[in-house]
Amino acid sequence: MATSVAFADRTVKANDPNISFTGRVQRMDNGAVSYDWVGTYVQTDFTGSSIAARVSEEGESYHQVFIDGKLMGKLRFTGKEPHDIVLAKNLGKGTHRLRLQKVTEGEYGRSTIFSFTAG
């Protein structure tokens, strides 16, 4: 579970101690975290009205985005080059909890998260 320390208006690497991953993951020397198993999820608290992630994907994967326990939607991850993807925006002010969960089987793609940015 994520700790109570939230980040705001800054970028943090995926391996930050305030970001927790559940499932089989590979932590990289550059601060990125990769995974391909269905059901793997990342959870963290953040302060702000939006959150984005810098990701890459070997193949194609779908992830469900939950904010404060509510399913916000499903996002498609594609593209081998790192790029930014908005996970949620137009949220109320304050601290929120993000949960991003892979819902695609591993043979369809391997996801890598480099960082998160809250705004």
Which residues does each PLM region occupy?
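Bacterial N-terminal signal peptides
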Residues: M1-A2
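N-terminal secretory targeting modules
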Residues: V5-G119
